[in-house]
Structure formats: structure tokens, C-alpha cells
A protein has these predicted regions:
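Bacterial Sec-dependent N-terminal signal peptides
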Residues: 1-22
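Glycoside hydrolase catalytic-domain context in secreted enzymes
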Residues: 19-393
């Protein structure tokens, strides 16, 4: 009897001790900010820097020593992109990376129906989650300014208010699945010609009334967890590391607590990347489609060049800790969230959602001259022009 009592007492003492030994950052019952600070305190300098840049075409490293997993991103706004090889743009040939092709976001905006936007986000978020993605690189809310912008199909039209009201439910739908939406391209990225070198000139009223409202609503109404910078420049600084747009407006005026991710190839300077609001660097020295330096991740602007500046005492770690806090916050909201659902792929519900959204987005146009339907007796050939005519995306 004494042995039994002793065993019970020992168990009663040991169980609380074991519970106390569980690190705060691994305890999902704790507030995220407590978990972030606990994890931050355990990281080495090298581990912190590794969190801020890519390790492959679409992923960034975690911290295996602490059980912090990698972050996996994927395109795109209206369908989950097939996986590519680790350091190449060729498709990996996986057997589980099909997806439902949802209508373009132009069509979604044309529904004028936030319920359809929520359904869209929920459905595509489930597909991203099933594929184990942490971040969905979309949606886009750049304002239509020219019909020649080849990426207009990724965006939600020319009305800032409509775009903002439609993007917020999409974000909430995606993030219900424990997948971060990544609203892009912040900001003023309204055409594709010379997109890496164009310095956009815009007055403050147009900036705040036309180009920023949808992004602001994405942050303050949608609660988005990540934002992607743009390729172009504003006030002479690239928008993936721009003091005014990222630090002053996004993180300052709007109180954004998430992660700023560079567009692929959008980072150009280590010191500006350190100080001007960029948190995670992806795709440097690549055009985002085919070209790129091979296995160059340790040489990214926020990789060894950043680490060396710290070691040499030329920059401090205040900015680094802020970046890492944001990245850890993202990780705890997504891949380390034990309550996120499993997701699903190619389900009848997703196909039905795509059909419903497509139907509601139909816009009736006047058929002048009876152009449609095409008379095959008169039109023997139809010309399809452009890269997508020959390339499988």
C-alpha cells in the first residue's frame, strides 16, 4: 500500500514538472506573442538570418534544432501551382499537385458578391492546405490602369473600394485553413513594361485614394498575414524595400504585424533590405520564370551579406529581431497551428464553387456586328498569340 501511495505522490509531483518543461513556443495554448518571444530568445544569430531568406525556389528554412518547420509558398491567386524542382523551374512531376482552376480574380470582382469571395478563399485555401503550403501567393489588388497589363487577370478591377471589399473575404477564407494569404503587389505595380526599373510618380492624393485603399482594407479588414512587395520603384527606392510604403505606411500607419515578402527577383540592396521593411527574400537573381543563379541562396542580400555586416559590427540586430518576430508569428499562425484543418483537393465542392463564381461573374456584352459565335465557315483559322499559347504553366 505504501508503494502504491508513493507512486501516486510521485506521479502527482512529476506531471506538473513535465508540463512546466514544455517550452512556451511549443505550447499552442499560450498567446502567440509569448510563443514568439520565447522562440526568439532560443535562436542563434545564424538561425535568425536563415529564417529571412529562401532555401529553394519556393521555400525558406525552419529551425530543425527547435522543431520549427520550413515555410512553403506557392502561386497563385486562382489555382495552386504545380510543384517545381528544388532549385529549378521545371515541374517536379508530383502526382498530388493537380488543382481546380478557379475563375480569374477579374471574374470574382465582377460578381460584386463578398460571399462568393469568401467561398473562393475557403476553397482555394483548402487546396493549398492539402498540398501543405504555408503561404498562398495571392490575391492581387493592383488597380487596372492599362488594358495592356498582362497581369490584370490576377487583380480585382479598377475600383479601389470594390477591390478592397472583395479581397477581405477572400483573405479570411484562405486563412481559415491555416494558410497565409499574401496580398500583392504592394504597391503601384500597374503595368509590366520595364517593371524592374520604372520609378512611379504619383501624388499623395492619388496614392491614398486610388492605389492604396484595397491594400489597407486587406490589412485592417481582412487581417492578412503577409504582403508581397512590388518590382517597381517609388521615391527612388524599390518597393520590396521601401521606407515610405513598408515602414511608414504599411507597418506604421496601418499597424501591419505580418511578413513582407519580396517578389521573386525584387530585392536589390542588402542595407535597404535590412532597414526598409523587407522581412523575407525570395527569388533573387531570377526572372521568376526560367532564368536564375544556381543554388545562390546563401548569397542572397539577406543571407551571408547580412550576417557578415552584423558580425563586423556595421549593423545591429534590432531590425533582424523584428523580421524574425514577424516570421515566427506567421509560422505559429500556419504550419505550427495544431488546429488548422487538413484541407482537400479536387473535391466536388470546389468544382461547384468555381462554377458558381464563374456564373455570377458573367458580364453581358453587346455583340456588335454578330462577331460571336464565330462562324467557322468564314473563319478557318484562329490565331492564339503569346507565351501561354505554347507554354504549359
Amino acid at each position: 500500500m505504501k508503494k502504491v501511495l508513493f507512486g501516486l505522490v510521485l506521479a502527482a509531483v512529476a506531471l506538473p514538472l513535465l508540463a512546466q518543461q514544455k517550452p512556451v513556443y511549443l505550447d499552442a495554448s499560450k498567446p502567440i506573442e509569448e510563443r514568439v518571444e520565447d522562440a526568439l530568445s532560443r535562436l542563434t544569430l545564424e538561425e535568425k538570418v536563415k529564417l529571412t531568406h529562401a532555401q529553394s525556389k519556393f521555400s525558406s528554412a525552419g529551425v530543425p534544432r527547435l522543431g520549427i518547420p520550413d515555410v512553403w509558398t506557392d502561386d497563385g491567386p486562382h489555382g495552386i501551382r504545380p510543384d517545381v524542382l528544388w532549385d529549378e523551374w521545371e515541374q517536379a512531376g508530383c502526382t498530388n499537385d493537380s488543382c481546380v482552376a478557379f475563375p480569374a480574380l477579374t471574374c470574382l470582382a465582377a460578381t460584386w458578391n463578398p460571399e462568393m469571395s469568401l467561398l473562393y478563399g475557403q476553397s482555394i485555401g483548402e487546396e493549398a492546405r492539402y498540398r501543405n503550403k504555408s503561404v498562398l501567393l495571392g490575391p492581387g489588388v493592383n488597380i487596372y490602369r492599362t488594358p495592356l497589363n498582362g497581369r490584370n487577370f490576377e487583380y480585382m478591377g479598377e475600383d479601389p473600394y470594390l477591390a478592397g471589399k472583395m479581397v477581405s473575404p477572400y483573405i479570411r477564407g484562405v486563412q481559415q485553413n491555416g494558410v497565409a494569404a499574401c496580398v500583392k503587389h504592394f504597391a503601384l505595380n500597374n503595368h509590366e513594361v520595364n517593371r524592374h526599373t520604372t520609378n512611379v510618380i504619383v501624388d499623395d492624393r492619388a496614392l491614398y485614394e486610388i492605389y492604396l485603399p484595397a491594400f489597407k482594407m486587406a490589412v485592417q479588414e481582412g487581417g492578412v498575414w503577409s504582403i508581397m512587395g512590388a518590382y517597381n520603384l517609388y521615391k527612388g527606392q524599390h518597393l520590396c524595400h521601401n521606407q515610405y510604403t513598408l515602414n511608414d505606411i504599411l507597418k506604421g500607419e496601418w499597424g501591419f504585424d505580418g511578413v513582407v515578402i519580396s517578389d521573386w527577383g525584387g530585392t536589390h540592396d542588402t542595407r535597404q533590405a535590412i532597414t526598409n521593411g523587407l522581412d523575407m527574400e525570395f527569388g533573387s537573381w531570377t526572372n521568376g520564370l526560367s532564368n536564375g543563379a544556381s543554388n545562390a541562396y546563401d548569397n542572397y542580400y539577406l543571407a551571408n551579406p547580412y550576417l557578415n555586416l552584423i558580425r563586423e559590427g556595421k549593423v545591429g540586430t534590432t531590425e533582424l529581431d523584428d523580421k524574425v518576430r514577424r516570421i515566427l508569428r506567421l509560422i505559429f499562425r500556419t504550419v505550427m497551428n495544431p488546429d488548422r484543418p487538413w484541407g482537400s483537393m479536387l473535391s466536388p465542392e470546389h468544382y461547384e464553387a468555381a462554377r458558381r463564381i464563374g456564373e455570377e461573374g458573367i458580364v453581358l456584352l453587346q455583340n456588335k456586328g454578330n462577331v460571336l459565335p464565330i462562324d467557322l465557315n468564314r473563319a478557318k483559322k484562329i490565331l492564339v498569340v503569346g507565351e501561354n499559347a505554347i507554354k504549359m504553366m
